[in-house]
Amino acid sequence: MMKKILAVCFVFISAFAFAQEKPDALKMYVEGNYAQAIKVCESEIAATPNRIDSYVVLCWALVANKQYSVAEQRASDGLAIGPNDLRLVESLGEAKYYLGKNKEALALFERYIAGISDSASRVGVAFYYMGEIYIRQAKYQHADISLTAAVQKEPLLDRWWTRLGYAREMAKNNVLAMAAYDKALELNPSQHDALAGKRRIEKNTR
């Protein structure tokens, strides 16, 4: 009886030790160790091909590591397994955005926002990228709407306020553009683009 108990304890302790030693790809991603996170996720997928969470972290790490073409492919691979995983939809949108595929990226961000909870962590990010796409397309009123939604979700990012100011400036909405630039400079007094934007407006309204 004692031997059986000891054997069970040994198995349990061994399993616990293995779990403790198992690499944590998400932790690596959060800590900025993108290359290692990618390696771990690919190993997990090789061992368990249908593991959607591994695809999700993999794509986050690939985008963060600026491997956009690979991220596009791996997000598509993940969606072939879990076509309704909105985390992969958003990651695919980011990859396509950086690859200049604006129309496809915009559709993916719209799909993500329509399907995800309003409190999801990357809703603000999706709105931000939509705003940037609209700026690329010179649709500045649309960009204003999207970037306004983005800063409502993430109000402490001076870069986002600066881009909102730029969209409003391009739409000739100088009063609100100045307000956005001022907010950016409140958050970061050395925000160069916000300072430049304010100077342009001041020069053009003299």
Language-model region placement:
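Canonical tetratricopeptide repeat
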Residues: 57-60, 91, 125, 129, ...
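N-terminal leader/linker segments that initiate helical-solenoid repeat arrays
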Residues: 17-56, 206
